[in-house]
Regions:
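Extreme N-terminal basic, low-complexity initiation segments
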Residues: 2-8
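Phosphate-centric recognition/catalysis
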Residues: 27-40, 44-64
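Conserved active-site and cofactor/substrate-binding residues in soluble primary-metabolism enzymes
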Residues: 48, 79, 101-105, 109, ...
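Short acidic-glycine loop/turn motifs at beta-strand connectors
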Residues: 57, 76-80, 180-183
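Conserved mixed alpha/beta catalytic, RNA-binding, or beta-rich assembly cores of soluble enzyme
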Residues: 62-117
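Short glycine-rich phosphate-binding loop at a beta-alpha junction
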Residues: 123-130
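Phosphate/ribose-phosphate-bearing ligand recognition and processing surfaces
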Residues: 135-147
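Divalent-metal-activated hydrolytic enzyme cores
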Residues: 146-191
Length: 191
């Protein structure tokens, strides 16, 4: 089930990293979490918090709330493995411990976690969500935080050769996202 898949992903990422995190330091293994809260039609639901990622090799619906943050949803339609991240900033300051709060870390960690859970890298498809400019004061500013988050996500996916098959980005309103890990279906509602 999802908990076993999560444990396998965490073990793989610990081995791949080859280092033990210091106290308070985040690793990909530490942010692949399972937050079950109900089932709908026999499919478990999970809520994804900002700065985390979620991967499942069994059917699951993952929801999150986005403003200027971005979520990249990845899925392998053949292996029926999918996952979602939720990052807040395009990148962290220099000399900052790696964290899924940053797009430059969260997107590669999500790719690695999906491959560890059984997805084939060449079969991965992406959907990108979020990146709104929700603060009125910044709406006239070119290159607002939401736009930068979207740009980072798209650049990494392009560099990794992962096609973006759908997106709902930018704008002035937040979004509620629900993503199904097993088939890549996604629903977005403006807030």
């Amino acid at each position: 089930g999802p908990r076993a898949a999560g444990a396998a992903v965490r073990a793989f990422l610990r081995r791949r990293a080859g280092v033990r995190p210091e106290r308070g330091q985040q690793t990909a293994a530490a942010v692949v979490d399972w937050f079950p809260y109900a089932t709908t039609g026999g499919v478990p639901n999970a809520y994804l918090h900002a700065g985390h990622l979620f991967v499942a090799g069994t059917p699951c619906r993952v929801s999150t709330i986005l403003g200027s943050c971005v979520s990249v949803a990845l899925f392998d339609p053949v292996a029926q493995v999918g996952g979602l991240n939720h990052f807040l900033l395009p990148q962290g300051p220099e000399n900052t411990a790696p964290s899924a709060r940053f797009g430059t870390i969260a997107v590669p960690w999500l790719i690695d976690a999906l491959v560890a859970a059984g997805a084939q890298r060449r079969a991965l498809q992406a959907k990108v969500f979020g990146g709104a400019c929700v603060l009125r004061a910044f709406r006239t500013t070119a290159g607002n935080l939401g736009t930068k988050n979207v740009q980072v996500a798209k650049a990494i996916l392009q560099a990794e050769g992962i096609p973006i098959v759908a997106e709902d980005v930018d704008g002035e309103r937040g979004r509620k996202l629900i993503f199904q890990t097993h088939d890549g279906a996604a629903w977005v509602r403006s807030l």
